Amino acid sequence: MEKISLKYVAGVMLLLKSSLIGFLVWKIVTSPNELQSLHFDKEFLLFVGAGFLAQIIDGALGMAYGVSCSTMLLGIGVPPAIASASVHTAEVFTTGVSGLSHIVMRNIDKRLFFRLVFTGIIGAIIGAYLISKILDGKIVKPYIAAYLLLLGIYILIKSFRTINDKKSNWKHAPLLGFIGAFFDSIGGGGWGPIVTSNLIDKGNSPKEVIGTVNTAEFFVTFFSTGVFIFFIGVDAWKTVLALIIGGVIAAPIGAYLIRFLSPKTIMRLVGVLIITTSTYTIYKSLH
């Protein structure tokens, strides 16, 4: 695997991304009823806002787009499967740009990339299938909210920890990739907080970890999106479009804010946001 050039990885990414764009364009063109159903109403603006806030967080922190966006969508009332499908479809575009940028800047460790990507794809496919076909959305919603709540607490605790110097270690990277992708597909987020934070905590270079994990995330989100499209379609393309619009607007702002806020401060803000919103979602689900 180490003999495979990153240029080929970038080429595959561009091919897959182009195929998804082509499919979405074809779907919209051949479904005029869906196109006519688009209304720039309050709901649409709420989705734009969710995408906007999530992208600002991700741009400043380098993770937590999915978990932040999914938490807000669940809080708004979007069903778990639709929320996860929408977030992952939008993420194909954001992670694609991010991954290609890291390849150009050579922020990637190829050995770590191939240890993550294959098990990550398998975990993403299994998780997406379960939330699409097996698990009942109404029943599983409070459990997903509880998972996001724990993830928020995890992020908050991480923000107060000092990372000690350790020898670089990615021995359990394949298992970590599977677990991160599996819960990411089911919960709509968690790949970054689970995979990135654990690899950095084990002493790996933050620069290479973020670049490698973000690039692998493109393939995770692409294949989970494929499963979602196959089983539940793209009826939620209104949500997807709103998330993309919000993310595009927020992208330069998030990159700008990173100059003024430390990563630990952002992690604390993200943790509090996720804990608060998830708690509210659980409360609504039980009453």
Please tell me what each predicted stretch does.
Residues 68, 91, 144, 194, ...:
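Conserved active-site and cofactor/substrate-binding residues in soluble primary-metabolism enzymes
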Residues 95, 213-229, 238-251:
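A small-residue-rich subset of transmembrane alpha-helices
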Residues 64-65, 96, 122, 126, ...:
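Residue positions within transmembrane alpha-helices of multi-pass solute transporters
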Residues 61-109:
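Juxtamembrane transmembrane-helix termini in multi-pass membrane transport proteins
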Residues 1-53, 59, 72-76, 104-186, ...:
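Juxtamembrane transmembrane-helix boundary motif
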Residues 92-95, 149-152, 218-222, 275-278:
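Small-residue-rich packing faces within the transmembrane alpha-helices of Major Facilitator Superfamily
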Residues 84-92, 210-218, 248, 274:
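Transmembrane helix-bundle signature of multi-pass membrane transporters/permeases
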